[in-house]
């Protein structure tokens, strides 16, 4: 029998599933979120160390169009819902970042970290700049976000 490791301090779903860590299957939360239909905002509030970042990482890995997550979700509750998996798994562009390591001692430092995280997230989608379906105006906005010049209050 393979000995599983405790995921102390790990909140990345892919790291847990790919590296032999204990994982308590909460993928039915994804089913609950996606079966509700379109909603403008879903707010998830829980105390610290309650699994919010892991839950968001799980959702990001499930939806991200840049990934092939079938094997990662194999054997989990959500994999039994084949209709939902066909409709949603790896079908969406995902921009994901966590604030768990963000120093919020001052507004300026938290804001600076947010700007950098947003620009870094946009780097993964630079291929969109070559897409003819994207307008020149949107490409210009995209480039300014990449250069941090558009992100201001």
Residue ranges of predicted features:
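C-terminal leucine-rich, beta-strand-based interaction scaffolds used for sensing/assembly
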Residues: 2-5
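Conserved small/polar residues in nucleotide/adenosyl-binding loops
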Residues: 151-153
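N-terminal pre-Walker A segment at the start of P-loop NTPase domains
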Residues: 8-31
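A conserved segment at the C-terminal end of the G1
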Residues: 57-63
């Amino acid at each position: 029998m393979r000995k599983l490791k405790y995921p102390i301090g790990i909140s990345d779903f892919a790291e847990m599933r790919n590296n032999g860590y204990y994982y308590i299957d909460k993928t039915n939360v994804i089913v609950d979120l996606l079966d509700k239909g379109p909603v403008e905002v879903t707010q998830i509030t829980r105390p610290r160390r309650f699994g919010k970042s892991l839950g968001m990482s799980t959702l990001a890995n499930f939806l991200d169009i840049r990934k092939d997550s079938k094997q990662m979700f194999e054997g989990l509750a959500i994999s039994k819902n084949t209709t939902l998996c066909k409709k949603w798994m790896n079908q969406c562009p995902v921009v994901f970042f966590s604030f768990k390591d963000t120093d919020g001692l001052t507004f300026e430092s938290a804001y600076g970290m947010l700007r950098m995280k947003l620009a870094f997230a946009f780097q993964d989608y630079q291929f969109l700049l070559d897409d003819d379906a994207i307008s020149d105006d949107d490409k210009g906005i995209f480039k300014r976000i990449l250069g941090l010049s558009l992100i201001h209050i």
